[in-house]
Amino acid sequence: MSSQQFPRLGTPSPGLSQPPSQIASSGSAGLINQVATVNDEAGRDADVGTREHVGPSSSLPPREEKQEPVVVRPYPQVQMLPAHHAVASATPVAVTAPPAHLTPAVPLSFSEGLMKPPPKPTMPSRPIAPAPPSTMSLPPKVPGQVTVTMESSIPQASAIPVATISGQQGHPSNLHHIMTTNVQMSIIRSNAPGPPLHIGASHLPRGAAAAAVMSSSKVTTVLRPTSQLPNAATAQPAVQHLIHQPIQSRPPVTTSSTIPPAVVATVSATRAQSPVITTTAAHAADSTLSRPTLSIQHPPSAAISIQRPAQSRDVTTRITLPSHPALGTPKQQLHTMAQKTIFSTGTPVAAATVAPILATNTLPSTTTAGSVSHTQAPTSTIVTMTMPSHSSHATAVTTSNIPVAKVVPQQITHTSPRIQPDYPPERSSLIPISGHRASPNPVAMETRNDNRPSVPVQFQYFLPTYPPSAYPLAAHTYTPITSSVSTIRQYPVSAQAPNSTITAQTGVGVASTVHLNPMQLMTVDASHARHIQGIQPAPISTQGIQPAPIGTSGIQPAPIGTPGIHSAAPINTQGLQPAAMANQQPQPEGKTSAVVLADGATIVANPISNPFSAAPAATTVVQTHSQSASTNTPAQGSSPRPSILRKKPATDGMAVRKTLLPPQPPDVATPRVESSMRSASGSPRPAGAKPKSEVHVSIATPVTVSLETISNQNAEQPTVAVPPTAQQPPPTIPSMIAAASPPSQPAIALSTIPGAVPVTPPITTIAATPTLSAPVGGTPSTVLGPPVPEIKVKEEAEPVDITRPVSTVPPLATNTVSPSLALLASNLSMPPSDLPPGASPRKKPRKQQHVISTEEGDMMETNSTDDEKSAAKSLLVKAEKRKSPPKEYIDEEGVRYVPVRPRPPITLLRHYRNPWKAAYHHFQRYSDVRVKEEKKAMLQEIANQKGVSCRAQGWKVHLCAAQLLQLTNLEHDVYERLTNLQEGIIPKKKAATDDDLHRINELIQGNMQRCKLVMDQISEARDSMLKVLDHKDRVLKLLNKNGTVKKVSKLKRKEKV
C-alpha cells in the first residue's frame, strides 16, 4: 500500500520526508499507517489515523480479529462494488476531504456481505480512506485507497481478504490494518475458526496476504488484474500503488461502483495491473478502472488463474503493468509477468518463492510475460518464484501462467520453497492474488536492497516495483510480494514474490508464508529476506518458501546492503524499506506481509504497518493450513514421512515461541524459520519435520513498529522492536532458529539488519500486536494484531505453543502487544482436529494393511476437510445452541408454550451409514468373501434368547394386522363415497346422453372396482398372516419348558444372594 504513498513520481523526498510526517500522523492515528509516508499518504495518514486505526493505520489495533478489514484497492472488483456502494454500511467511511486535485478518495468500507456482517462493529471504523494527498507533493495521485472493510466475521468466508491488500493507498497501514485487523487473513484458512477473518471466504485465508492468496476460494476473490488500461497508472497494481501512482494520469476514473470515481480511479489508475484479490468485494472503483476485476474466484479451479477480463494480456497468465504515467518515474510495472497465476486450477503450488530481482533502479520496462526486462534494474524486482518440483503441484504451477513470470535474469537467489501444491486448487486460487500490485513497489524496494544473489528458482517472477527510478528507495512503497498463501497459491508475485520482493524491498514484509511445507514455516525466509533486503525483517516467512529458506529467504540471504541502508536511511535504504515493510505487509499482494494465505490460515503478518516506515513489516505467515500444509510438501528438506515421525511440534512450538518472545524483527522470519523455513536453511527437521503445515510462524516480522522510528530510528528501532530491536533480534532469532538448524542464517540476517529498521521489530507478527504498533506510531499497529489471531497454528505445529509464544511476544507489540498476542494465542490455538500442542503427530501405519481396514472412518473422506470446517462452524453453532429454546411457560392469555425440539426426520436410512470406502462393497479377491455358515439353532438357545416370549406372542403380527384392518376400512370409506357420487350424478341424466358424464361414470366405476379388489386382497393377506399365531400356545409351551429353567434358576440365585 505504501507504494501509493510514495509518489509514483518517484520523488524520493516524499518518501523520506514522509516518515516523520508519518510518524506524526501515526501517532495521532494510533495505528496510522506508514502510509503517511506517501505524499498523499501523509495527509491521508492523518485522516486515516484519525479516522480509525483501522483506517489506513497500519496498526489497526487488533481489531476484531474476526473482522477482516479488507482494503480494497479500488479495483474493479465486481464483488466488492456493491459493498462499495454500501460504503457507509460497514464502516464509516471517513474520507478526509482530499484536495480537489485528488479526486476524493473514498474509503470504502463495507462489511462484506460475505463476512459476517457486522460482527465487529469496530471494523467499520477501520475504513481506510485515502487521506488527501495534499500533504504530499503529489496531489495528482488520488489516494485511491478504498478500504473496504470487510466485516467479515464470517469465519470462513474468504479465507483471506485479499482485497485488503489492495488498500490502495499504499497505506501500509491499510494493508496492515487489513492484516492487522482482520484480515487475519492470515488465518483465513478455512480451518480458522469462523471468527478469524474468513473474510472472504474460505477459510485461507485472508490477511495481508489475503490479496495474494485468498485463502479460500470461497469468497470470490476478485483479483483485479490490471486491466489493460492505457494508463500505466492503472497498470500499476492498483492496490499497492494507488497512491503511489498519482492518480494524475487518470484521476477521476470513475468507478462503476458508487465509490467516488476518483478514489477508485485513483486506485485503478494507479495500479491497473495488479490484481487485487479482493476478498469479495471489489472496489467498484476498480471497475471503473478499465481493469476488469479479476476474480480469482474459484481457487479450486484454475488455481488462481487470475482472469482479468479486461486485460487482454495473458489474462491469467500475466499481468503487464504499464508504468504509471502519473508517476514521473517510468515505473514500468513488471507486473505483466507477475500476473500469471501460478497455479493451475487444481494444483496448489506451494508458495513459490519469488526472488526479487535486484533490478537496478533502472527504469523498469514492462516486461512481457515471457521475459522480464531487466531494464528496470533497481526498480523492478524480479521475483523468482521457484516452484520446486518437490511438490507435485509445482507442476501445476508451471502450467499456470506463471511461466510468463519466469525470468531467469533475476539475481535473486531465492530458492523458492518448494511449492506445496498440496493445497487444493482452491487454495491455489488465492495465490494469484495480485501480488502484482505489490510487485511494483516491491521492485523498487528491492532494487534498493537489491542484488541479493538469488537462489535459482524455478520460476522467477518479475515484480516490477512501481516506483522505479523515480523514487527507487522511497518509492517502493510496499512490496507486494508476500506470498503468504499457505497454499502457495502464490501469485507469482504474490506468493513468492513477496519473498523476493519483500526481501528485496525492505523486507517488505514478505511474509508470505507460504505453507509450502505444511510443517515448515518459511520463517526463515522472512528473516532472511529481511537481511537481504536489508529490509528489516520482512519476515518473509513463507512457508512455502521454506524449502529454500533462501528462496524466499533467498532474498534474505543476501542481506544486501539494505540493512545498512536500513539503518541509515530507513526510508532511503529501505527506501521505503520502512515503506517497504509496510509494503511488505501491504504489498500489493494484498497480503501484506505474509499472509499466509494458505488456505485459511494465513497469518498475514501484515508486517509493517507503514509502508514507508522502516519498521519491519511484520509478516507472519504463520499459520499454515494445517491440513493443507501438512499435505503440502513435507518439508523441503525432509521426506514427508520423517516429518510425520518427527516430533516437530516441540521444536516448532519452541522456535516459534522463542521467536515470538523475543521481539526481533528479523525474527519474524526467524521464528518462522524456526519452524520450517529454517529448515530450508538447513535444518533437516524443518523440512520434513512436520507434515502438517504448521507454520505457525506466527510471528510476523516485527511489527513495523519501527515504522515510526524508522525514519531515523532504524538503528534505534529497538524502540519499536521493543526489546532490543536490532541487536536483540538477532539473538532472538538464533534462539528461534535454535530450534531449526538454520538459525545461523536468520540470526545473521538479523544482525545484519539490526541497523535496518525492519529488523527491529520482531514483531511477532502474528501476535501482531496491534497495540504495539499503535504505540509505535501506528505503523507498527499494522503489525497485525489481527493477523495474529488469524494465525492459527497447526496443531501439529504445536500451534498452541506458538500461540503462547506469540502472546508472549508482546515484544512485538513492543509494549502492548500482549493483548493482541493474547488473541493470537487464542487463535493460534490449534485448529480443530489438531493435536494438543504437546502431542506428537499421529503416526500412520507404514504399510496399508487391508484396503478396507485402512479406509477412513465412516462418512469421512481421506482428504476430507470436515474437521477443519467444523471448527469454524462450531463457534457459530455453539453460539446458536446457547440460545436454547426457552423453557415451558404460559403467557398472559393462558396459552402454554412448549419448546419443540426439531427431531430428525424418521427414515429407514438413518442407521445406514455408507462409509466413503471405495472398496467397501467391492471385493478384489475370493478371500475377501466368506460364506457365512448357517448353524441351526437349538431349541434351548432359541428359548433362552432375550424377549423370545414376547415375539412368540406375535405382537408385531397383531400390530401389522391392525394396520391392515385400518387400510381396508379406509378403502371401504372411499368405496362408499364413490357410490354416493355415482348415484348422485348418473340417475338424474342418462349416462349415455353425455360423453363427459359417461367418462366420469366409467372412472367412478373403475375406482369402485379397485377399492373392492384392494379390500379383498388386504383382508386375505391379514387372515393368512394371523394364521402364524395358530401355533402360539404350543410354541409358548415349548419355550417355557426349555428356556425357563435356567432363567428362573439364575433369578432365584440372584434373589437368594
From Swiss-Prot:
Post-translational modifications reported in the UniProt record: Acetylated. Sumoylated with SUMO1.
GO cellular component: nuclear speck; nucleus; Sin3-type complex
Any Gene Ontology biological process: in utero embryonic development
UniProt biased composition (Basic and acidic residues): 41-54
Residues found modified as Phosphoserine: 416, 439, 864, 884
Post-translational modification Omega-N-methylarginine, affected residues: 206
Residue numbers of Phosphothreonine PTMs: 329, 865
Ranges of biased composition (kind: Polar residues): 14-28, 620-641
Protein task: Acts as a transcriptional repressor. May function in the assembly and/or enzymatic activity of the mSin3A corepressor complex or in mediating interactions between the complex and other regulatory complexes.
Similarity-based family: Belongs to the SAP130 family.
Subunit structure: Component of a mSin3A corepressor complex that contains SIN3A, SAP130, SUDS3/SAP45, ARID4B/SAP180, HDAC1 and HDAC2. Interacts (released by dead or dying cells) with CLEC4E.
Name of the protein described by the UniProt record: Histone deacetylase complex subunit SAP130
Organism expressing this protein natively: Mus musculus (Mouse)
Taxonomic path: Eukaryota, Metazoa, Chordata, Craniata, Vertebrata
Encoding gene, per UniProt annotation: Sap130
